Amino acid sequence: MTTNEAIKERASYRGKYLEEAVSRDNLEIIMEAGLAAPSGCNRQTTSIVAVDDSALLEQIRPLLKRVGMTAPALIFVLSEKIASYHGNCYSVQDYSAAIENMLLTITDLGYASCWVEGYMTDFKDGVGKQIAEILKIDPKFELVCCLPVGKPDEEIKRVAKKPFEERAWFNLGN
């Protein structure tokens, strides 16, 4: 699959997963893709934890809100707030680039996933903090995202994107 094909094929999958394990080799390929993403001033503020241990998965799954509850592997994205250009922090852009790299690699390897962030970082639910405690993550990191990974058990439904002409232009204003 080419990069462009992976971009067009990628879709958010919120269904059930087959019980088929994701190999450690493939998890490492996915994680390496995330770590290869660009970062502001090369601060490399993004770190990644993959969970494929059944005992840990059983502790974490009750905290997930349906999406990824049956995935054989979960990838958690961690962010460290480090100042870079003119003292600004670009960790959100850094981890977003890492997540997209991983989503494209997940698609390329024939797996499905979904970018799960909202309730991970929502202070009301505190799910990210609870998972970070289970995984004994250093407090200097914020757990910002979960990517369930596995073979889909259902058809992946792709949502139509708005037409190019509604969202992209050449030489706008000229």
Question: What spans do the regions from the language model cover?
Answer:
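Acidic, surface-exposed loops and disordered segments
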Residues: 1-174
